[in-house]
Amino acid sequence: MKIGIYCFLTDYSIDVAKLAVEAEKLGFESLWLPEHPVIPKFRTMQSYLKPGSEGAEELPKQYFDTVDPFVTLGKASCVTTKLKLATGICLVPERNPLLLAKEVATLDLISNGRFIFGIGAGWCKEETEIMGGNFERRW
């Protein structure tokens, strides 16, 4: 069985180098980091949860504070040799496709082929639009 770690890393959470080294030592297969460049204060869709359900009103603080997954996974690649490094997920409609292709190829190169490119389209309309995407046409 392959077991990985998924977490929101922030400036107040564990350092990714320390986490990656320990994860590899303990036999974890992969480290997955999410992407949220910006979470607007006012959102038409507070969450993918049903309105009124627990957690639907406000997102946890780490959603607002999460680090860039590509830079952070690059750091993790420098202190590990076997741990696979993954985006869980990269919000493709919010990115320039040429720059994204370069970032993905670079991370795969510096990690010696250990990068897993997890992709998605996002759930927050305002975030997508702030980042230059079209929410209705994101798929």
Predicted regions span which residues?
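N-terminal beta1-alpha1-beta2 module of alpha/beta enzyme domains
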Residues: 1-79
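Flexible, glycine-rich active-site loops centered on histidine and acidic residues
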Residues: 3-15, 93-139
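Acidic (Asp/Glu)-rich catalytic clusters
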Residues: 24-25, 73-82, 104, 108-115
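Hydrophobic residues within beta-strands of alpha/beta enzymes
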Residues: 31, 85, 115-117
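Glycine-rich, flexible loop/turn motifs
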Residues: 60-66, 79, 85, 124-127, ...
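Conserved strand-turn element in the central/C-terminal portion of the radical SAM core barrel
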Residues: 86-94
